[in-house]
């Protein structure tokens, strides 16, 4: 009985932190192969190494971070293991890339968003399907999901073969303001993480989704380094603030402007 009570208390403590047990594994645990059909990997024609992630939002469009822009991008869809391909994996290249700023620049707290139109639409399959854009902004206190092929250790760079997933908490923007003193008073970014540390998005997770209630609410942008430090949440581009711009571009209004 004592053992059962101890185990129960540990479980409650674990759930209260909204994180999975891991010895400072930044990305959490291996994602279920069927839970991320919208997650895409980016590499270049010269290198097969994944350097960023992105999100399929319909059969012809991918959403990622502006900092993930490169020449000769290759977009891999339906991928789980880098070394054991899925039968339905597909590769695409960009037809067009859209940014909030014509100079393709961004700041650490603003406009870190890139919309990619694929040269050919993808075919939905077991491991390929889009994720919905947000219908409303996320609420403070929400438990949201992050995922990607980013490093899974804090002391050195260790890239996994498969994407890792973890749950983190949505905080008020003021929490990040107190940590990162140069943040402006207002920003189109979201503040999310685990205050106890140990769970975080990190290098190569950039551009990937922050998922709340089954919708993409954020794009991995930046945070403290080393990653997963206590009391240092990360910043995510607030997708809801850019929804009108995204939908206008997809509808054919390529001169649409981002919110100021």
Swiss-Prot record:
> What does the UniProt keyword field contain?
Blood coagulation cascade inhibiting toxin, Disulfide bond, Glycoprotein, Hemostasis impairing toxin, Pharmaceutical, Secreted, Serine protease homolog, Signal, Toxin
Signal peptide range in chain numbering: 1-18
Enumerate the Gene3D superfamilies for this protein.
Answer: Trypsin-like serine proteases
Protein modification: N-glycosylated. The toxin exists in multiple glycoforms.
An example of a GO molecular function for this protein is: serine-type endopeptidase activity
What SMART domains does the database record attribute to this sequence?
Answer: Tryp_SPc (SM00020)
Miscellaneous: Negative results: does not hydrolyze fibrinogen, prothrombin, FIX, FX and protein C. It does not induce platelet aggregation or agglutination. It does not bind to platelet phospholipids. It does not bind to factor FXI and FXIa, FXII and FXIIa, kallikrein and thrombin.
Q: Pfam families from the entry?
A: Trypsin (PF00089)
- Where found in the cell? Secreted
Kindly report the protein's main subcellular placement as a broad class: secreted
Biological process terms from the Gene Ontology for this record are:
proteolysis
Q: What does this protein do?
A: This is the first member of the serine protease family that has strong anticoagulant activity and lacks enzymatic activity. It inhibits activities of three blood coagulation complexes: (1) prothrombinase complex (composed of blood coagulation factors Va and Xa (F5 and F10)) (IC(50)=164.1 nM), (2) intrinsic tenase complex (composed of factors VIIIa and IXa (F8 and F9)), and (3) extrinsic tenase complex (composed of tissue factor and factor VIIa (F7)).
Q: Which residues form the propeptide?
A: 19-24
Region ranges (Key residues for binding to FVIIIa): 172-186
| GO cellular component labels | extracellular region; secretory granule
Tissue expression summary: Expressed by the venom gland.
Its family remark reads: Belongs to the peptidase S1 family. Snake venom subfamily.
Q: Which PANTHER family match?
A: KALLIKREIN-1, KALLIKREIN-RELATED
Identification of the protein by name = Vaa serine proteinase homolog 1
According to the record, the segments passing through the membrane are: none
| Sugar-modified residues | 123, 253
Per UniProt, residues of the Peptidase S1 domain are 25-251
Here the disulfide bonds are 31-165, 52-68, 100-258, 144-212, 176-191, 202-227
